[in-house]
């Protein structure tokens, strides 16, 4: 979503001093229509009419044209109630949790044309909040249903994890995108885009737990084999150690590794193609192997050190909490 919002805005990214993009001034009428299409894989029949078949070609276009744009588009309008109504509609209209998560994407599509109309950094910051709100609303809805159906032991376990996730998400966002001072007026856009990403991921985690209770089949989406943010939180709401793998500004694959009470290092990695990433610190003092285990976290093993390295050869650290 961040790429969509940044399209066409090469200038105007200076430091406007916009720290808070959560402004929600309600205008007289919503600029987004109520229609959201649904995907229902369980109820598909082979006896669809010719008319339905012909209309299939137009499905995507109707999904993407639910927004009325005009010269006075109000980016400060509070869409929270509109989004909640859309999410409730998706929940009641989806045949399974798998379909539900797919249909939430149609709400994202519904707001995309309006977000693409943003011309200034402030408008981009404000509109980026909508997509985070969509997944945050879905996550809360999923949690409410999970809480109602889970047995006490399961609920206690997942509740502890959820509280830890909530407690850490601000810190991991800062670790991933940096501070406001580093990013200037783009900070709210970067913040909302990353919160959207990790909240969507968390929605899938809770949906998976709910599916187990309901006896539904549910397939988690594949996580990147190279990039992600993983932490060791010692079963608390604090980040003790962290591993971030991402693509740098110049296209290089970089990793930031911080180990509790030892130190941190930054460097680049090469994908060996066997599920392992070969890491070398920028100063050459640390070499090691990163293993990304998808939703189950990641690990880092130090294979070689030289000089005044912050880590010891043979040391291995696990980062079991995946964001």
Residue ranges and their predicted role:
Residues 8-12:
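C-terminal motif of bacterial Sec signal peptides marking the signal peptidase cleavage site
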Residues 15-112, 221-231:
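N-terminal, intrinsically disordered, polar/charged segments of Gram-positive cell-envelope systems
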Residues 96-144, 255:
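Alpha-helical segments in soluble extracytoplasmic regions
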Residues 118-133, 149-151, 181-195:
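Second-shell loop/turn segments in exported
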Residues 154-185, 189-194:
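Long, amphipathic, charge-rich alpha-helical segments that form helical bundles/coiled-coils
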Residues 217-240, 320-323:
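Tryptophan-anchored aromatic micro-motifs
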Residues 221, 265, 271-273, 304-323:
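Edge beta-strand at a domain terminus
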Residues 236-275:
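N-terminal glycine/threonine-rich, aromatic-flanked beta-hairpin/loop signature
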């Amino acid at each position: 979503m961040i790429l969509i919002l940044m399209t066409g805005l090469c200038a105007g990214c200076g430091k406007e001093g916009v720290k808070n993009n959560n402004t929600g001034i309600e205008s007289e009428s919503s600029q987004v229509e109520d229609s959201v299409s649904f995907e229902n894989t369980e109820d598909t029949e082979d006896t669809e009419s010719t008319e339905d078949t012909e209309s299939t070609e137009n499905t995507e276009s109707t999904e993407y044209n639910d927004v009325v744009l005009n010269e006075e588009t109000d980016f400060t309008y509070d869409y929270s109630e509109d989004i909640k109504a859309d999410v409730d509609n998706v929940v009641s209209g989806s045949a399974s949790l798998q379909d539900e998560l797919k249909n939430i994407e149609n709400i994202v599509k519904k707001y995309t044309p309006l977000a693409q109309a943003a011309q200034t950094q402030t408008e981009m910051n404000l509109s980026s909040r909508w997509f985070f709100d969509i997944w945050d609303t879905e996550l809360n809805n999923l949690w409410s249903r999970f809480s109602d159906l889970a047995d006490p032991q399961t609920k206690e376990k997942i509740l502890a994890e959820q509280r830890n996730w909530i407690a850490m998400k601000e810190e991991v966002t800062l670790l991933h995108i940096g501070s406001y001072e580093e990013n200037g007026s783009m900070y709210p856009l970067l913040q909302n885009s990353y919160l959207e990403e990790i909240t969507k991921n968390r929605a899938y985690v809770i949906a998976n737990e709910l599916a187990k209770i309901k006896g539904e089949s549910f397939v988690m989406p594949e996580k990147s084999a190279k990039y992600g943010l993983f932490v060791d939180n010692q079963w608390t709401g604090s980040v003790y150690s962290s591993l971030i793998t991402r693509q740098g500004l110049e296209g290089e694959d970089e990793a930031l590794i911080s180990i509790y009470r030892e130190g941190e290092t930054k460097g680049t990695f090469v994908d060996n193609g066997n599920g392992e990433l070969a890491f070398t610190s920028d100063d050459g003092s640390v070499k090691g192997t990163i293993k990304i285990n998808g939703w189950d976290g990641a690990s880092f093993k130090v294979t070689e050190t030289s000089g005044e390295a912050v880590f010891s050869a043979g040391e291995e650290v696990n980062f079991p909490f995946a964001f």
